[in-house]
Swiss-Prot record:
Function: Catalyzes the cleavage of 5-oxoproline to form L-glutamate coupled to the hydrolysis of ATP to ADP and inorganic phosphate.
Stored PANTHER family: 5-OXOPROLINASE SUBUNIT A (PTHR30292:SF0), UNCHARACTERIZED PROTEIN YBGL-RELATED (PTHR30292)
Subunit and partners: Forms a complex composed of PxpA, PxpB and PxpC.
EC number(s) per entry: 3.5.2.9
Protein name: 5-oxoprolinase subunit A
Catalytic activity: 5-oxo-L-proline + ATP + 2 H2O = L-glutamate + ADP + phosphate + H(+)
InterPro entries assigned to the protein according to its UniProt record, in alphabetical order: Glyco_hydro/deAcase_b/a-brl (IPR011330), LamB/YcsF/PxpA-like (IPR005501)
NCBIfam families, A to Z: PRK05406.1-1, PRK05406.1-3, PRK05406.1-4, PRK05406.1-5
Family per similarity comment: Belongs to the LamB/PxpA family.
GO molecular function, one term: 5-oxoprolinase (ATP-hydrolyzing) activity
Enzyme class, UniProt record, top EC level: hydrolase
Organism: Salmonella newport (strain SL254)
Gene Ontology BP terms: carbohydrate metabolic process
């Protein structure tokens, strides 16, 4: 059994270089919520050095709140902003002799696109128009995945090791209790359930089905590196191969 393990990088975390030795895919911030040209270049070089698949991590224009502010923007604006960010990273990747493999929206753009078909359509169209061979990463079972499929993109359904789930398979908003899982054992058990059994237990105690093709681990947590190592060890023990 294979699973992709991804992390968001280029967001100001000192652990990026070490984290890139543990994951198979990197989602690199493109400047709208965090990062700049220099951090993008640094992350691309580190990813290439470690054989990690490179992806763009576009966001709403929201550096003040790390891309976590809800916004209502015209789909054409979201299309243009997404295309702009993908193109910026794509130029750096190409200049370094690499190939960009995927796109994963960030923060509130990701969450809103999971439920808003028009927003999801704008993102999927931007990805397709830039490069139809790119993989679109989105929340498992979401509108973003469906929009990607309509554009005949390869999609990858994502689950989160350290996030709480609602009964409908969506993530618990960060403003609500249970949004983040701080207990390492609970996060590990949840991840293995999602990957091996295709199910997740919601904060209300209801089990719901989920398709896990890639697992996100956040690099900004206090124990992120230790957890990443434990998760890799748990996968190895169960003959689950981490591969992009």
């Amino acid at each position: 059994m294979n699973i992709d393990l991804n992390a968001d990088v280029g967001e100001g975390c000192a652990s990026d270089s070490e984290l890139l030795t543990l994951v198979s895919s990197a989602n690199i911030a493109c400047g709208f919520h965090a990062g700049d040209a220099q951090t993008m270049l640094t992350c691309v070089r580190e990813a290439l050095k470690n054989g990690v698949a490179i992806g763009a991590h576009p966001s709403f224009p929201d550096r003040d709140n790390f891309g976590r502010t809800a916004m209502v923007l015209p789909p054409e604006t979201v299309y243009a902003q997404t295309l702009y960010q993908i193109g910026a990273l794509g130029a750096i990747v190409q200049a370094q002799g690499g190939v960009m493999r995927h796109v994963k929206p960030h923060g509130m753009l990701y969450n809103q696109a999971a439920k808003d078909p028009r927003l999801a359509q704008a993102i999927a169209k931007a990805v397709h128009d830039y490069d139809p061979s790119l993989i679109l990463v989105g929340l498992a079972g979401s509108e973003l995945i469906r929009a990607g499929e309509r554009h005949r993109l390869v999609t990858r359904q994502e689950v989160f090791a350290d996030r709480g789930y609602q009964a409908d398979g969506s993530l618990v908003p960060r403003t609500q209790p249970g949004a983040l899982i701080h207990d390492e054992e609970q996060a590990l058990a949840q991840t293995l359930d999602m990957v091996q059994a295709g199910r997740v237990k919601s904060v209300t105690g209801v089990w719901t089905t989920v398709t896990a093709q890639t697992v996100c681990i956040h690099g900004d947590g206090e124990y992120a590196l230790a957890f990443a190592r434990r998760l890799r060890a748990a996968f190895n023990a169960r003959n689950i191969h981490v591969i992009a």
